[in-house]
Amino acid sequence: MLMQTSQGQSGSAHVVVMGNEKGGSGKSTTALHIAVALLKAGQRVATIDLDCRQQSFTRYINNRRAWARRTGLDLELPVHCCIKLGETMQIADNESSEFQQFMDAVSAVERTFDFIVIDTPGSDSYLMRLAHSMADTLVTPINDSFLDFDVLGTVDPATYSVTGESHYAEMVRDTRRKRRQLDGASTDWIVVRNRLSMLGSRNKQLVADGLKELSFRLGFRSIDGFAERVVYREFFPRGLTALDDLDEATLGTRPSLGHVTAREEVTSLLRQLKLPLDERGRRRAANRAEWFTQVDKPLEVHDILGA
């Protein structure tokens, strides 16, 4: 599911940031699917929610924890932190408080976890920019329309050719440049097309062509994400993902073809992200899977006698 590459030698966690200045693009849904996929691969995962107001990522994880408790299922859960909104009358004091919380959260996990998955608010803010500057992998989900394309660039209304970059795209380019100057690291920027129509259309092709043209100008990779499916909306109240067991006990309903197709989409997305896994994590995942296999089997005579 996830591509294995060499981990860096710094000993720091690989930081995956979900970023888009427009809300409703599927950042939180994509973030949890990435986190759960990494956990299932045996990686140690911490998550941070910087969307102090909406907290969709936090609610998604809390829903998952509550559903696991209610059903007795062993659902993988990351170590999670939600940054609290500053509540003073002074903007500077609020930003200082939120910054300190964020730094404390990162410091607590960066040396002992393999990955940190960060969800950012759908608006420009100091914390959002800071998270982007820390990203090893930046994932920008957009809905498959020119309304959402506008967060990255502008197009000619007659020819649909790209005419310029947006404020957000310029911010990302600036933070990536500063990151390279600071420590020589390069941020892998991936734009994920979400809510894809399952039918071909002229608009769908025009958006794809626009992203291809813009990718050369901005240096990102464009990949297909999630189609417009009811199952993704149904996952949220129970905190589930398309990677969890597709059975009635887990889903709380009978699985459908939509669940199977959604899993295929998510698996394809995660493979294309090319996130780095270490071999220790792969062994942890294999040992965990073997343990669950043995738990489901009755004890053999030689197990009882210790032979």
Residue ranges: model-predicted function:
Residues N63-W67, P157-T159, T241-L243:
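Short, hinge-like loop/turn segments at secondary-structure boundaries
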Residues T88-S97, D150, L199-Q205, T253:
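Short, flexible/disordered intra-domain loops and linkers
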Residues V15, G19-S25, A37-I116, G122, ...:
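P-loop/Walker-type NTP enzyme "switch/lid" segment
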Residues T58-I61, V151-T154, N203-K204, F235-G239:
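Short aromatic-enriched loop/helix-cap "lid" or pocket-rim segments at secondary-structure transitions
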Residues M1-S10, Q181-A307:
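C-terminal lobe/tail of nucleotide-utilizing enzymes
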Residues T30:
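Hydrophobic positions on the alpha1 helix immediately C-terminal to the Walker A/P-loop
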Residues H33, A37, L130:
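Active-site signature of alpha/beta-hydrolase-fold catalytic machinery across serine-
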Residues A41, P121-D224:
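Conserved catalytic-core segment of NTP-binding enzymes
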